[in-house]
Amino acid sequence: TALQYAVIEGVSFGILDGVNSIKFVNNNFSDIFVVGGGSRSSFWITLLATMLNKKLSLCDQSEFGAALGVARLAMFVDNDISDKSSIINKIKIKNTFNPNEKMFAILEKRYQLWKDIYISNKNLYYIL
């Protein structure tokens, strides 16, 4: 339905906004991996790939990806583990999703509108 799409699009715009903030600090990344519950939706991953205008890779066993990533980070900072290379294994890719070029221009305009609405209503968040 339209309401479901609006929610997915709004969350995706929020993710795009975060990625744009990261790009402001460091634009030197090419690989983006998708993990977690949202990765079960090929529709959503394709929408994100289009918004980000980047290929997204779905990791094998992506439902465990976030927890595994946190566990690996914890192990990486553990001074008792001397061989740090054993922690990081090559990520197995289950599927890749490419941007939909026809939709990119449309979503880019909608993102600018979303950003304008977000900024103009920012003061209301403190009241709510």
Q: How would you describe each model-predicted region?
A:
Residues 1-128:
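Glycine/Thr-rich phosphate-binding loops that ligate phosphate moieties of nucleotide
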